[in-house]
Design a protein with these regions (language model features):
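Short, well-structured N-terminal submotif of metal-dependent ribonuclease cores
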Residues: 1-41, 54-61, 122, 128, ...
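Active-site neighborhoods of divalent-metal-dependent phosphate/nucleic-acid chemistry enzymes
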Residues: 74-117
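Short, structured coil segments at secondary-structure junctions
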Residues: 71, 123-124
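Hydrophobic helix-cap positions at the C-terminus of alpha-helices
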Residues: 31-32, 69, 106
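Active-site-proximal, substrate-binding regions of enzyme catalytic domains
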Residues: 19, 26, 44-48, 52-74, ...
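Alpha-helix/helix-capping structural signal
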Residues: 9-10, 44, 81, 118
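Short, active-site-adjacent cap segments at secondary-structure transitions
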Residues: 12, 47-49, 119-121
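Hydrophobic side chains within alpha-helical segments
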Residues: 10, 16, 51, 96-102
């Protein structure tokens, strides 16, 4: 089974039902629910997702969505090493750098799924769009 790290924006696309992006994100998480792929996100993503979802759906719905999310993903830690590597990386987006180095901590991660391919141009592992995970 393929193992992918999912960028925060893709998770938010699904949970916030973002027009134009939600369908591909839902397909990815549906595949995880069927046991066809294994998905991971980093611990830091939870606070970002909560902050954004709370604005759309309120605190209770945001927390409920995050609880449900734990059924679909493994949560990778963000430790001092990840932070240091991200701070000194060539990534233009610091949050993406953190996610990248969190993903690298798990050798079984085969790719990062994001809508922002360009932000991961310095990635050490393959980067895919949400529509490409099943290819």
């Amino acid at each position: 089974m393929k193992h992918y790290f999912v960028d925060t924006n893709v998770v938010i696309d699904m949970l916030a039902d973002r027009e134009g992006y939600a369908d591909a994100a839902c397909e990815l998480f549906d595949a995880a629910g069927r046991g066809e792929v294994h998905l991971s996100i980093c611990a830091l993503s939870y606070s970002t997702i909560y902050y954004i979802l709370r604005k759309y759906a309120g605190k209770e719905n945001a927390i409920s969505s995050l609880r449900d999310l734990t059924d679909y993903v493994s949560i990778l830690p963000v430790d001092a090493e990840v932070i240091r590597k991200a701070l000194y990386s060539e990534f233009s987006d610091y949050e993406d750098a953190i996610q990248h180095y969190a993903a690298l901590q798990d050798a079984s991660v085969e790719g990062i799924i994001t809508r922002n391919i360009e932000d991961y141009r310095y990635s050490d592992i393959p980067v895919l769009l949400p529509t490409e995970f099943h290819k």
